[in-house]
Regions:
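Oxyanion-binding and handling regions
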Residues: 1-24, 34-36, 91-200
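Hydrophobic packing within well-folded, soluble alpha/beta domains
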Residues: 15, 39, 57-60, 82
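Residues at secondary-structure transition points
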Residues: 30-38, 69, 73, 77, ...
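Phosphate/pyrophosphate-binding loops at sites that engage ATP/ADP/AMP, CoA/4′-phosphopantetheine
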Residues: 43-59
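Phosphate-handling active-site elements
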Residues: 50-55, 84-93, 109-111
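DPxDG-like acidic metal-binding loop motif
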Residues: 59-95
Length: 200
C-alpha cells in the first residue's frame, strides 16, 4: 500500500509518498502562495528522486482545509485530476485531524481526548477528537482565543506548534486504512469567507 498525499492549504505546498511500512518521502515548496506554478514541479521531483510513478501509488489523499482559499482549491483540483487519470481511490482529510494525528504520536500512552487548534489571522480553527482520532465535534472557527466554548480543559491534550506537511496527512490515511476507520470523500472545508467575498 502506498499513498500519495497533497497539502496546499498553507502558504507553502508539500507532496508526500507514504509506503506500506509507513516510510515517508516528501517534497516541499516554501515559496509563499505559489501553489499553481509549483505543484507538478514538486510532484515530478518527488517521483524522480524516489523512483515512483502513478502505477506504484495505491491511494490518493488531499488536505481539504481549513486554510488558504486558493491553496485548498489548487490541492483539491490537482488531486481530483490525478484521481480521474489514474482511477486510484481519493480521500479528503482536514488539517485539524492531521494535527490531532501528530499530537497522538507525542502522547502514545494517553487515553485523553485531543483538541486540535490551528491559529489563523482572525483567531483559530479547532476540533475535538477521541484518543482513537475519531471526531467528537465538527471543525469550527473562533475569533477569540479565550472563547469559553473552546477552552482547553485538563481532560484533553493539545499542542499548537505542530509543523504539518503532506507526510502527516499520508500517515493519517495510512493509520485509518490500517485500523479500518472511515475515510471521507473530498469536500472543501472553508471555515472563513475569502476576503474578496466579504466586500460583495
Amino acid at each position: 500500500m502506498s499513498i500519495l498525499a497533497i497539502d496546499t492549504v498553507g502558504t507553502g505546498s508539500s507532496i508526500a509518498i507514504v509506503d506500506y511500512d509507513g516510510n515517508c518521502f516528501v517534497e516541499r515548496n516554501s515559496a509563499s502562495n505559489n501553489h499553481v506554478e509549483s505543484f507538478f514541479q514538486i510532484l515530478n521531483t518527488l517521483f524522480d528522486k524516489h523512483n515512483y510513478n502513478y502505477d506504484k501509488i495505491d491511494h490518493l489523499a488531499v488536505v481539504v482545509g481549513p486554510g488558504s482559499f486558493t491553496g485548498i482549491r489548487v490541492g483539491i483540483s490537482a488531486a481530483q485530476g490525478i484521481n480521474l487519470a489514474t482511477n486510484k481511490p481519493l480521500y479528503g482529510v482536514n488539517a485539524l485531524e492531521v494535527q490531532a494525528y501528530t499530537i497522538s504520536l507525542l502522547c502514545t500512552n494517553s487515553k485523553k481526548n485531543i483538541r486540535a487548534i490551528i491559529k489563523n489571522a482572525q483567531g483559530f480553527y479547532t476540533q475535538l477528537f477521541d484518543f482513537n482520532l475519531l471526531p467528537l465535534s465538527g471543525p469550527t472557527a473562533a475569533r477569540e482565543p479565550g472563547s469559553k466554548c473552546h477552552a482547553i480543559s485538563s481532560d484533553c491534550i493539545t499542542h499548537m506548534d505542530c509543523n504539518l506537511n503532506a507526510s502527516h496527512a499520508g500517515l493519517l490515511v495510512h493509520y485509518r486504512l490500517k485500523n479500518k476507520q472511515k475515510l471521507n470523500e473530498v469536500e472543501a472545508l472553508y471555515l472563513n469567507e475569502p476576503q474578496y467575498m466579504k466586500s460583495l
